[in-house]
Amino acid sequence: MAIRVRIPTPLRKLTGDKGEIEAKGANISDLMENINKTYPGIKERIYDETGEIRRFINIYVNEEDIRFIDGNKTAVRDGDEVSIIPAI
C-alpha cells in the first residue's frame, strides 16, 4: 500500500493528466522528493528557491493542514491521503 496524493488541475500536465498518484515517503519532504523523481518538475512548482512550500500552496494530510502539524517533516504512512491545493 502507498500514500495517495491528489494532484490539482494546474499540475496534472506534469503527471500525465493524473488527478491522483501513489507515492512513498516517511514525511512530506521525502514524499515530494519521490514524486519529483517520477514526475520531474513538480517539486519546483510546489517549493520556492529556498526549499519552502510556496505561500500559495497548501498541503493536507488526511484533511489536516501540515502548517499546523510539522510542515515538511509531517509524517505520512501507507494509506494516508495527501492533497496539494493551490490557493485561489
What are these regions (language model features)?
Residues 1-88:
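Ubiquitin-like/PB1-type beta-grasp interaction modules and other compact soluble beta-rich domains
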